[in-house]
Amino acid sequence: MQLTAVGLNHQTAPLSIREKLAFAAEHLPDAVHALAHSPAADEAVILSTCNRTELYCVGDTERIIEWLAEYHNLPIEEIRPYLYTLDNNETIRHAFRVACGLDSMVLGEPQILGQIKDAVRIAQEQESINSHLNALFQKTFSVAKEIRTDTAVGENSVSMASASVKMAEQIFPDIADLNVLFIGAGEMIELVATYFAAKNPKLDRKSTRLNSSHLKLS
């Protein structure tokens, strides 16, 4: 058993694959408990966001990949091309980069650090984390705090949610004149809706799926 990470993100996999390998928030506690108490791993933290799914473990890399495929009921050959695997020092460096927002779609975005802290807390509650991963993530949080405090990383950073509003403002003269439809369900779409609501659009609606009625132009 060694320190390892298995994952995929917006750089390695299209949205369709990322969605298949994501862990719903309500299922994450049971999933991380199952992984850490399986033959694949002795310790585990599962980070699952809209742009990445990463399994930080003390375990066997190949068995972790097999567990991931089996958990999501997918052929291992279907997911393997999109995965990256990291060992020991590579895992440590990667955790630092992710926590600092250096591996994010929006450079320096602050939301990811809170998401990692939530993932670690869930793993602790499920008794799925021990000395190795505790040490890794305590150091990760310390490094992220230092980087964000002492460097320009994150100085002008924005979350994906606020970035979507900024992009809309560059395209449309006034968001207050728009009808806005939000498609999806989860933390990110809630944040996007909150940012747009602050701009007082004429109408905002939410839908968990796209259907033909949404495609009609008025």
Describe the residue ranges of each PLM region.
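A glycine-rich (often HGG/GG-containing) alpha/beta subdomain
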Residues: M1-S104
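Glycine-rich phosphate/diphosphate-binding loop of Rossmann-like nucleotide-binding domains
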Residues: A168-R209
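Short glycine-/acidic-enriched loop or helix-start segments at secondary-structure transitions
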Residues: Y56, V192, S218
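Alpha-helical elements of the RecA-like P-loop NTPase motor core of helicases
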Residues: E66, G114, E190
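Glycine/serine-rich phosphate-binding loop and adjoining beta1-alpha1 elements at the start
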Residues: E78-A176
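Single conserved hydrophobic/aromatic residue that forms the stacking wall/gate
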Residues: K206, L210-S218
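Active-site-adjacent beta-strand anchor residues
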Residues: V58, T85, G154, F182, ...
